Regions:
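N-terminal accessory targeting/assembly segments
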Residues: 1-87
Length: 87
């Protein structure tokens, strides 16, 4: 990435999403917080973050359509320019 791209992305309004498998006992909140810190470390502006439970990993339907519609509305409402999907 060249310096022009870095300047253009500086402070970009970003939504951070961390999907997790519902049956897992992992610390999903810690992983979401880590994703937010990563976004901030590369000078993006986290304006919203969310955990989303998934039943299983399926590349065809990773996120359910209802959540995609919800996420689309968040992008519109918050004028987000980037979604960071922490997978």
């Amino acid at each position: 990435m060249n310096s022009l791209n870095v300047k253009l992305m500086n402070n970009t309004p970003t939504i951070v999403v961390h999907p997790y498998i519902k049956r897992s006992r992992g610390s999903k909140e810690i992983l979401l917080e880590e994703a937010i810190k990563l976004v901030q470390a590369i000078n993006l502006n986290c304006i919203y973050s969310s955990l989303v439970g998934i039943d299983s990993i399926n590349p065809k339907t990773y996120l359910k359509s209802g959540y995609v519609i919800f996420l689309k509305q968040k992008v519109i409402d918050l004028s987000a320019e980037l979604i960071f999907l922490n997978t």
